[in-house]
Amino acid sequence: MQNMFPWLTVIILLPLVAALAVPLIPEKQVKWYSFAVCLVDFVLMVAAFFTSYDLSNPDIQLAERYRWMPQIGLEWSVGADGLSMPLILLTGFITALATLAAWPVTLRPRMFHFLMLAMLAGMVGVFAVQDMVLFFLFFELELVPVYLMLAIWGGKGRLYAATKFILYTAVGSLFILVVGLAMYFYGDLRTFNMVELAAKNYDPTFQNLCFLGLLIAYAVKLPIFPLHTWLPDAHGEATAPVHMLLAGILLKMGGYALIRMNVGFFPEATQLFAPLLIVLGIVNIIYAALTSFGQRNLKRKIAYSSISHMGFVLIGVGSLSEIGMGGAMLQMISHGLIGASLFFLVGATYDRTHTLILSEMGGIAPKMPKIFAMFTACSMASLALPGMSGFVAELMVFVGMATTDAYSFQFKALVVLFAAFGVILTPIYLLSMLREIFYGTLNHAVVHEEDLVDAEPREVFIIASLLVPIFGIGLYPKLTTDLYAPTTDQLTRVTRERIARAAPPPALLSGVYSVEFADRDRVSLR
């Protein structure tokens, strides 16, 4: 049903229109202007979902459809369901805090805040649009601000990192365009509308090819090994606000699109690729955790930690269970908060120590007790300490994988065993990182004691704002799971039903899927 007030259109266009006015704002006031726009946009998001969104309805709500180019089926189509609504709220929340983190930027501040506002519009658009062409356009729109913010405000290797980022993501985006056009021309109905595309009956070979194409595209963004190498380079050169947007929101676009399109459009192909997603998730978790051990650069260490944590999203999606799919969604939300907080603290620490090399740090805890306490709390969240959001998300993925009836006992046991090994690695490298940064003796040859100023109120506010939902989700996850559960449960159920009507899995996967699932004797969910 068409929504009466165009909430999502206003939410998308507000930061874009406001960005056009940035050149008119005095340079000293532009940071206040940018923060105010992001705050107003976030308030509009909360108001829209509080007043016009039914949590029990799993379908698209706040829908708007306006003809754009009817000759070829293009339209402005936006909407939100349980997959997109939490991520839209996460985008508004983290972007508002990222603009606050950008206050110390003195090089071309107008241009920087212009790009931040444009990026907000692009990121919200990715989660809200219901048209493949619009999705592609917004997916591309958010690439340009990130490239410029890396290339202009990054570190010494910024041009290499920015070029690598744009090449990887642009090539990945081409697969989205090709698959979108292929679906448009498939069958008699010419449409780019996602709901109508999902309703088409694609033959198995077409589904498999399209699933693979989109998987490559989103493997870059998530990222998935071996298409992950742009992320450590980008994080290694980015400033704190860009870190927060990269870790907090951009990586989630890959996970969101994987669920929305790969699973939603091609459920029969999901049967073939679900075990691959699980294996790739295990590789992400263990490979990135082991690689993080060897990183002496603090930013790159946290970047590989992010790659490791996103592996749980792949396992949750591949589990073909309601609990696992819900765990994947919660892991994206949780990591968005934790990743943004950790990278902000990395930036705050670098501003004081002027080094990212762990061997050059040490002994700064007595001089910066607030930063030490906040860094410790956020690291505990990252290693999935009980009572914090990371624990609940990873637990749901484990339970979903262990209890799903889709896979054989042997396969489930191996997955849980390897994933548990990755979980054990996480506290080892995070706790050793804390020891190298804050304990020991101060390296006076590199770090100047007079620069070690403790956290200012702005920095405390940013981290406190992120820790509140981290603890809130950890202590009472139902507040968050209720936002998406009806949609993820329905999506998983429909996927299982479509798989049940399709051909049995190939003989190659005979030892992976359970006998009951392969024989189609039951399709019930656990």
UniProtKB/Swiss-Prot annotation:
Transmembrane segment boundaries: 5-25, 32-52, 87-107, 111-131, 133-153, 165-185, 211-231, 239-259, 273-293, 302-320, 331-351, 371-393, 414-434
Keywords of this entry: Cell inner membrane, Cell membrane, Membrane, NAD, NADP, Plastoquinone, Quinone, Translocase, Transmembrane, Transmembrane helix
EC category name: translocase
Membrane topology: Multi-pass membrane protein
Principal localisation: membrane
Enzyme Commission number: 7.1.1.-
GO MF terms, alphabetically ordered: NADH dehydrogenase (ubiquinone) activity; ubiquinone binding
Compartment list: Cell inner membrane
GO CC, one annotated term: plasma membrane
Family: Belongs to the complex I subunit 4 family.
Protein name: NAD(P)H-quinone oxidoreductase chain 4
Organism of origin: Gloeobacter violaceus (strain ATCC 29082 / PCC 7421)
